[in-house]
Amino acid sequence: MSERIGVIGAGSWGTTLANLLARKGLDVTLWAYEAELVEEMRATRVNSLFLPGIELAPALSFTNSLEEAATGKDFLVLVSPSQVMRGVLAQLAPLLRPGVVLVNASKGIELDTLMTMDQVCAAVLPPEVARCFSVLSGPSFAREVSLEMPTAVVAASGDPAVAAAVQRLFTTPSFRVYTNTDVVGVEIGGALKNVIAVAAGISDGLGLGHNTRAALITRGLAEMTRLGLSMGAQPETFAGLAGMGDLVLTCTGDLSRNRTVGMKLGQGMKLADVLGEMRMVAEGVKTAESAYRLARRTGVEMPITEKVYQVLHEDKPARQAVMELMTRDLKAERW
């Protein structure tokens, strides 16, 4: 393979994906916002800020210039936080040629517009560029992927040929990629699982046990599915890696930033203090508000999401939120 690849965003996930591709001997340029981080990675071959202890492949190069990262590339992997993605895409737009395959690896819903990342891309980029959009998602902690622990994810695109190209690009003996054409479902699954992970963390922080966590995961999946279906997603997507798979991992794994936020809230910390301790973005904090507003706009019932929003943004006590969920009107189980 002789593809030239740019990766936009040098957090833990962006660095991991860039390193995965560079380990295959591909020509990969990783863009970081912080100039000092670029210099450190060049000098030490380690991203000590976001992925400490992982040696970066010799084939991986680093830049603080979006022009250098994006110009002339065959694939551009987008790993900027979802709330700044629009601004990054606006800067990239004049640099991108038709035919470049865009791979979104960020998980969130834009707060101001309630758009998913594919919708943001379509709004900002010329149609001849945006048509090659894809999304890479699934249960994949960056550190485990970096350590080459077996991982399976999904590459989704409305164009099956684009999805297949992304599948071929990223697949390694330890990183298995499936294809899908349900971009909406994969994006909603990736975004909403972070909100439910905050809820699971709150439950763990309160010491409520495994029964509670299992209920939150199951009913959280129902909320994700209902919202996705209202937006045109396919129901089977939510039973797959980008739905149930990512949800289970993020709600149970100790490496989950969103679960960690919830756990500390459940233990009594204030949100500002929790976020002040974190170097990396917990997408579920902003996505909780986006999803809550999207549910109200679409008329989709999402009680767990509503309570997470209230705990995060209206200072509702965590234990009160749990009790309000448990004392809702009785009803039949439904999706």
Curated annotation (Swiss-Prot):
Residue numbers binding NADPH: 12-13, 107, 142, 257, 281, 283
Molecular function GO terms recorded: glycerol-3-phosphate dehydrogenase [NAD(P)+] activity; NAD binding
Keywords carried by this UniProt record: Cytoplasm, Lipid biosynthesis, Lipid metabolism, NAD, NADP, Nucleotide-binding, Oxidoreductase, Phospholipid biosynthesis, Phospholipid metabolism
Species whose genome carries this gene: Geobacter sulfurreducens (strain ATCC 51573 / DSM 12127 / PCA)
Name used for this protein in its record: Glycerol-3-phosphate dehydrogenase [NAD(P)+]
InterPro entries from the UniProt entry: 6-PGluconate_DH-like_C_sf, 6PGD_dom2, G3P_DH_NAD-dep, G3P_DH_NAD-dep_C, G3P_DH_NAD-dep_N, NAD(P)-bd_dom_sf
Family to which the UniProt record says this protein belongs: Belongs to the NAD-dependent glycerol-3-phosphate dehydrogenase family.
List of catalytic residues: 193 (proton acceptor)
Stored NCBIfam families: PRK00094.1-2, PRK00094.1-4
PANTHER family, per the entry: GLYCEROL-3-PHOSPHATE DEHYDROGENASE, GLYCEROL-3-PHOSPHATE DEHYDROGENASE [NAD(+)] 2, CHLOROPLASTIC
